[in-house]
UniProtKB/Swiss-Prot annotation:
The protein's name: Shiga-like toxin 2 subunit A
Originating species: Escherichia phage 933W
Matches recorded under Pfam families: RIP
InterPro entries: Ribosome-inact_prot_sf, Ribosome_inactivat_prot, Ribosome_inactivat_prot_CS, Ribosome_inactivat_prot_sub1, Ribosome_inactivat_prot_sub2, Shiga-like_toxin_subunit_A
UniProt signal peptide: 1-22
Molecular functions per Gene Ontology: rRNA N-glycosylase activity; toxin activity
UniProt keyword Hydrolase, yes or no: yes
Disulfide bonds: C263-C282
Amino acid sequence: MKCILFKWVLCLLLGFSSVSYSREFTIDFSTQQSYVSSLNSIRTEISTPLEHISQGTTSVSVINHTPPGSYFAVDIRGLDVYQARFDHLRLIIEQNNLYVAGFVNTATNTFYRFSDFTHISVPGVTTVSMTTDSSYTTLQRVAALERSGMQISRHSLVSSYLALMEFSGNTMTRDASRAVLRFVTVTAEALRFRQIQREFRQALSETAPVYTMTPGDVDLTLNWGRISNVLPEYRGEDGVRVGRISFNNISAILGTVAVILNCHHQGARSVRAVNEESQPECQITGDRPVIKINNTLWESNTAAAFLNRKSQFLYTTGK
């Protein structure tokens, strides 16, 4: 009887662990070096390098697949270089896709969860299920702020931290939405893209310049799923084309992209709207992801659009 009971409890625990799996990390904004080191530490723990997109110790990595509902927590530290304060903000990030599911005010032990993340459960906290979703479309509308041209500095992050500490209720406010947009950019998006990491980290220097998010940065974030579907096919071609994004060599890839989705994991969700244009996480299963033209790797949709425009031009000009 005891043996049967033990097996039942063990199965229950294993079943629970398959539903939710979590780890804790810290992103330290004290210095440029601590910031980059924090991001690299997280990447090492949650992803596996692609050997064919690697130079020295730098590589593009693929997120390790975990059970649905798995997440990791990121504690924000070092916003004030001189004092150990502003340390009650924790972001909850879904591991399989690096989407920010919500944030925890650790002073009140309250988890404010976005409406599109009801599948994420955090134990030991009071969960507030918000009516606001996490999409950039919604957050920009509520914030009355476009990401292209959005400025982020140490000072604005402190202000954003205070806005989230003051937040209560179940509907995002303008200030809270602006705060989330800034923190998502310098955490989740910086984990995905070295380009964003590199451009923002300068704002943590003693001269404290302001990082301004460029249209190119925004374009990267909106096409992460498409990039993730193409790069695993890369084998040293002369270039890669995904929409308006071009990589001319492996150095350009490594200087821009750090972590990609696990698009080819069997059973992984293949479609989920992630941006204003409702692009999927990864290309729908069964579609051919890439086409090679003149030793350049083209995302299939990009190639189709390009060839269509070219044929129309030839038709109208009679060439």
